[in-house]
Amino acid sequence: MARKTLTTALVKKFIPSRKSKSRKGENGIVLVVGGSYIYHGAPILSSIAALRSGTDLVYTSVPKINVASTRSVSPNLIVIPLVDQKLTRGAVNKLLGALPRKLDSATIGMGLAIQEKNALLHLVKSLLDRDVRLSLDASALIPEVLPLLANKNVVVTPHAGEFKRLFGQVPSNSKNERIKLVEEKAKEFGITVLLKGSTDIISNGSTTYLYEKKIPAMTVGGTGDVLSGLVAGLLSKNRKPLESAAAAAFINGLAGKVVQKKLGLHMTSMDLLPEISTVMKPFDKIM
């Protein structure tokens, strides 16, 4: 098993070049599905993070009760209402009918209220059948989804509690044991696992990347939603789950370091969003 610590030089290889004559839509189209009556902000953070990663278009699907508040945050968001307040089979069918033909990646689960597990499974399977790369987080991390994901270009981004719910095992406090468990589960289920923590562990079961953040300000709520948007945004262009997840973790951390230096321990996740552009600019490559 190859293990590597993430560095700027390594991550630069994971960020694709952009053609000087490229057109709108050629640099990534992303779908974000999330939100609920209580957690309206999560998909907003993910969507703006995906845009800041350099994605051309982001479609944000939230319950209809959240549509006005989501649209009011940014004119850059293309909002598709979910017809029900929670994820149902009917809501998924209508969403699938409203999506553009070309869709590169999607992130699902941030703040999402799910009424029917089968609705989530239907959404995941339908997107995978369209060759859409997926990043699953939060509410989407349930064990029932695992049989659909094997070797399908999927990233899961759990924290320790979500890891337990998804895989049925608690990550150890021992760093080495955590790494081994992530590698084991990634290999067993044919997916890329990004276990969030003070050290992010990213593995596809054959290669593992480590990123030790040491950014205590990033315990604030919503940083994981930003990360999910970065994963989806990078996945829409790179299309390699391991590299995209590793780059997303690194960039999220770089942005966090910039914000912590400015604001100390008083940051919010919204503060990360403009800094994504700042820290990603040195990675830009134009062909």
UniProtKB/Swiss-Prot annotation:
Residues 7-283 form the YjeF C-terminal domain. Pfam families: Carb_kinase. Gene3D superfamilies: 3.40.1190.20. One of its GO terms (molecular function) is ATP binding. InterPro entries: Carbohydrate_kinase_pred_CS, CARKD, Ribokinase-like. GO terms for biological process: metabolite repair; nicotinamide nucleotide metabolic process. Its cofactor is Mg(2+). It is an enzyme of class 4 (lyase). Its EC number is 4.2.1.136. (6S)-NADPHX binds at residues 42, 159, 225. AMP binds at residues 196-200, 224. Keywords: ATP-binding, Lyase, NAD, NADP, Nucleotide-binding. It catalyses: (6S)-NADHX + ADP = AMP + phosphate + NADH + H(+); (6S)-NADPHX + ADP = AMP + phosphate + NADPH + H(+). Catalyzes the dehydration of the S-form of NAD(P)HX at the expense of ADP, which is converted to AMP. Together with NAD(P)HX epimerase, which catalyzes the epimerization of the S- and R-forms, the enzyme allows the repair of both epimers of NAD(P)HX, a damaged form of NAD(P)H that is a result of enzymatic or heat-dependent hydration. HAMAP family: NADHX_dehydratase. Homotetramer. Belongs to the NnrD/CARKD family. This is ADP-dependent (S)-NAD(P)H-hydrate dehydratase. It comes from Nitrosopumilus maritimus (strain SCM1).
